[in-house]
Each structure stands twice: as C-alpha cells, then as structure tokens.
Amino acid sequence: MNPALFLIILIAVTVIISFKGFEDSYFFSKYQFHIGSIRKGEHIRMITSGFLHADIAHLAFNMLSLYFFAPVVYGELGNYSFLLIYFASLIFGSMLTLYLHKNDYYYSAIGASGAVTGIIYSAILLDPNLQIILFFIPIPAHLFGIGYLLYSIYGMKAKNDNIGHTAHFGGAIGGYLFTILVHHQILLENTFMVVVLTIPIVIMAVMAKQGKL
C-alpha cells in the first residue's frame, strides 16, 4: 500500500472513532483507559483508548504531529515497521500508565499520545537533523521532542486533565527501543542523538522512583 495512503487511513480511523467518542458518552466510557476496568480483565482498553481524545484540540495536535513525523519513519523503515513502532509505543504507554497508577482504580485517560510520542522519538532517531516549523519558526525536532516530554512531566504532576501524560513516556520508551530493534545500525550512525533522547526518560524514571510523579 502507498505509505501516504496508509497514514491517511490510520489518521481517518482515529478521527472517526474520536468523534464517535465526542458524541457518545457510553462509547467513550466503555473504551477509555480505566484502571479498575483493566484490572477486571478489560485489557482491550489499553489499545482502544489510543483512538479516543479529550477534545478536538487534543485530537488535532496528535494527528498533526503524526502527519509531520510519520513520513520519516515509514520512509526509512517501511509500513510494517512503522505500524510495529506505533502500536508498540501505544502499548508501552498503556503498560507504564497501568504500572504507575495500578492502585488508583478510578484513574482514566485517553489519547494517541503514547503512540505519537513513539513515532516522534523514532523519527528523531532516524533523522537527527530533522526540523519542524512551529509558529512559522524552524526548530530542531529533537528540541520539540524533549520539550514535549518535559511538558508531560508537568502534566503528570498536575493531574488536572484526562489526557494520558504518563503514556507519553511509555510511548517514548517504546518508540526508542523498537526503532533500535528494527534498525540497530542507528546506535553507531546517530550515537549522539541516541544518548540525548534518553535524558527526559531518565528524568522521569528518577522522579517516579522518588515518588514525585
């Protein structure tokens, strides 16, 4: 399948399901990430929550980020590796969220953020010189990626919305590990970026260990 069409289908499916969630509160509640329900055996929520969003702004940000970063990943690795990294990042995000909030039975979250963060990390690893245009200003993509995760630390500490900030970190870890797994030459080709992108992950791990998240 044409890679661009492949991406458009993924975005379209996410948009359709998200809008269904906007309009149908029962549907939204049934498929969102919810600790109590997952611990009762509804593990499908760890995947379906990645197709739901809090509002149009949340959906638009994730889909635009995916649209801009995904071509680097499927362009370098192909459609199947792109899908592997996307869903591995989504699942890693859900697993980390479940681990950190396992005793909070009422904790809930939604969003493709974990999967998208994994794709962002993957794209930066594959193309360290990648730049994005933010408010008409070109900035290095790795600064965007690190800033995105640092913002996630704030969101995890604030806990004032329904967005899966914890999933951002799990997604970053998934994207990082699976990109190296499918393209291990990157360890030698882009060693500096491989090291740089561990910084926010290490910060989060230390804060979690100290009980600050």
Q: Which functions belong to the PLM regions below?
A:
Residues 1-213:
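A detector for small-residue-rich transmembrane helices and their helix-helix packing motifs
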